[in-house]
From Swiss-Prot:
Designated name of the protein: Small ribosomal subunit protein uS19
Gene3D superfamilies: 30s Ribosomal Protein S19, Chain A
InterPro entries for this protein: Ribosomal_uS19 (IPR002222), Ribosomal_uS19_CS (IPR020934), Ribosomal_uS19_euk/arc (IPR005713), Ribosomal_uS19_SF (IPR023575)
Name of the encoding gene: rps19
Protein origin, superkingdom: Archaea
Gene Ontology cellular-component terms listed: cytosolic small ribosomal subunit
Protein's job: Protein S19 forms a complex with S13 that binds strongly to the 16S ribosomal RNA.
Family: Belongs to the universal ribosomal protein uS19 family.
Lineage, broadest ranks: Archaea, Methanobacteriati, Methanobacteriota, Methanomada group, Methanococci
UniProt keyword Ribonucleoprotein, yes or no: yes
HAMAP family per record: Ribosomal_uS19
């Protein structure tokens, strides 16, 4: 019986690198939401858009809009008029976290209040049909440091640097 030759992992890696060099760069896939392109979504009436969003968002939209949300809609229309004229629209600051992102809002920058500050978020195609509040989390993961002098009762036994 002939012994099989053992290969080190180095030769395979070289082959893979050569293959990667010959591959053409990837094209960006055209965005579609539930089978509709962004242009189709922007031309679509709001009633038709309500039919294709998930039930939670559909229910929120069906209940109507509050006076605060109506004010936000007016700000969005004003910003959209400015961008159509070629001017740079300012950040739209809002406390309305329960507002559903519609196709007409894409490309605008929002300052969404998270309970402490306004997080600036530029809305892209992938955010259609979500709530504004999903883009600005209210809680952050706490990164505690090591205990120092006076930090805790147990830090008495931590040697002084």
């Amino acid at each position: 019986m002939a012994r099989q030759k053992k290969y080190s992992g180095k030769g395979g890696a070289r082959k893979k690198n050569k293959q990667k060099q010959n591959v053409a760069p990837r094209r960006r896939v055209e965005f579609k939401y539930k089978g509709f392109t962004l242009e189709e979504l922007q031309e679509m009436p709001i009633k038709k858009f309500m039919e294709i969003v998930p039930s939670r968002q559909r229910r929120t939209m069906a209940r109507g809009i509050t006076p605060k949300q109506r004010k936000l809609v007016m700000k969005i229309k004003k910003a959209r008029r400015l961008t159509n004229r070629g001017k740079e629209a300012r950040v739209i600051r809002t406390h309305c976290r329960d507002f559903v992102i519609t196709p007409e809002m894409i490309g605008l920058t929002f300052g969404i209040y998270n309970g402490k500050e306004f997080k600036e978020i530029k809305l892209v195609e992938e955010t259609v049909g979500r709530f504004l509040g999903e883009m600005a989390p209210t809680r952050a993961v706490v990164q505690h440091g090591s205990p120092g002098m006076g930090a805790t009762r147990g830090s008495m036994f931590v040697p002084i640097k």
